């Protein structure tokens, strides 16, 4: 039986309205009652995740910024990884040929260059929001990650530009169809989960994980049991064809799977 369960948030644990369902919350509590350690592994900021965690009355480790930070149950930093300052400087100051908006994250929050109210819809549960600022004024040595939000085809073209400019100095991945992330080299949820597992005296074989996007690829592919959401990016399903695909986040599929796993661990699972 798994001893550590890792959950992506958007498109996985959260429903399409960006809230946690009642069944999901109840199932997470059942896992804790079985002494299974929880960690939320997300691209969201730790400041936002602390607020969400506080509303749940659950003990959980936090892997945030797509693996750039790990926080303990008490809120202490267990692991931190920032973008190479030269990479951050290049990304923030270059005039990219794109219509996508740029978003910069550091320990102080989420920063962008203009008001984009539509992006706040994903954060209605917590009330977390961006700060509008001159991006070029942000110190490059304090950047955890940078992401671009926009049309997928535009982001694919931007990824080519970024790869040419950054070469092998950063990790690029899609955390959603409309979001391209620039992360520290070697920084991802999978490597962070390996650090956390080691801290807990566990191996990745002792973990199960759930996700839906390409920023979950390393995590899902490295654990003892990786589960892909039915609403996942097709690229993720294609990249990890050996993993089981469960139901849709809108149907609280993680809760559905875990309820079966807790109650009938020896019976085959069907998402229907």
UniProtKB/Swiss-Prot annotation:
One GO MF term: magnesium ion binding
Domain of life: Bacteria
Chemical reaction(s) catalysed: 4-amino-2-methyl-5-(diphosphooxymethyl)pyrimidine + H2O = 4-amino-2-methyl-5-(phosphooxymethyl)pyrimidine + phosphate + H(+)
UniProt keyword list: Hydrolase, Magnesium, Metal-binding
Annotated Mg(2+) binding sites: 8, 10, 212
Needed cofactors: Mg(2+)
EC number: 3.6.1.-
CDD domains: HAD_Pase (cd07516)
Active site: 8
InterPro entries: Cof, HAD-like_sf, HAD-SF_hydro_IIB, HAD_sf, HMP-PP_phosphatase
Function of the molecule: Catalyzes the hydrolysis of 4-amino-2-methyl-5-hydroxymethylpyrimidine pyrophosphate (HMP-PP) to 4-amino-2-methyl-5-hydroxymethylpyrimidine phosphate (HMP-P).
Family classification: Belongs to the HAD-like hydrolase superfamily. Cof family.
PANTHER family, A to Z: HMP-PP PHOSPHATASE (PTHR47267:SF2), PTHR47267
Entry protein name: HMP-PP phosphatase
Organism, as annotated: Salmonella choleraesuis (strain SC-B67)
Gene: cof
């Amino acid at each position: 039986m798994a001893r550590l369960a890792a959950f992506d948030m958007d498109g996985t644990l959260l429903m399409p309205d960006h809230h946690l369902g009642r069944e999901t919350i109840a199932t997470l509590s059942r896992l804790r009652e079985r002494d299974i350690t929880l960690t939320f592994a997300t691209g969201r900021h730790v400041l936002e995740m602390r607020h969400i965690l506080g509303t749940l009355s659950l003990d959980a480790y936090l892997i945030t910024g797509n693996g750039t930070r790990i926080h303990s149950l008490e809120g202490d930093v267990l692991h931190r990884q920032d973008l190479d300052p030269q990479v951050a400087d290049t990304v923030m100051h270059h005039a990219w040929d794109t219509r996508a908006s740029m978003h910069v994250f550091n320990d102080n929050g989420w920063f962008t260059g203009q008001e984009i109210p539509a992006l706040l819809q994903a954060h209605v549960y917590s009330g977390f929001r961006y700060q509008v600022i001159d991006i070029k004024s942000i110190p490059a040595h304090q950047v955890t990650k940078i992401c671009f939000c926009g049309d997928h085809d535009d982001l694919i073209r931007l990824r080519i530009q970024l790869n040419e400019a950054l070469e092998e100095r950063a990790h690029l991945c899609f955390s959603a169809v409309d979001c391209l992330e620039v992360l520290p080299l070697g920084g991802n949820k999978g490597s962070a989960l390996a650090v956390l597992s080691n801290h807990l005296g566990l191996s990745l074989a002792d973990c199960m994980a759930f996700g839906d996007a390409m920023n979950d690829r390393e995590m899902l592919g490295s654990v003892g049991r990786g589960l892909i959401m039915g609403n996942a990016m097709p690229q993720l399903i294609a990249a990890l064809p050996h993993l089981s695909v469960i139901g849709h986040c809108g149907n609280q599929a993680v809760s559905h799977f875990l309820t079966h796993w807790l109650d009938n661990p020896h019976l085959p699972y069907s998402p229907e």
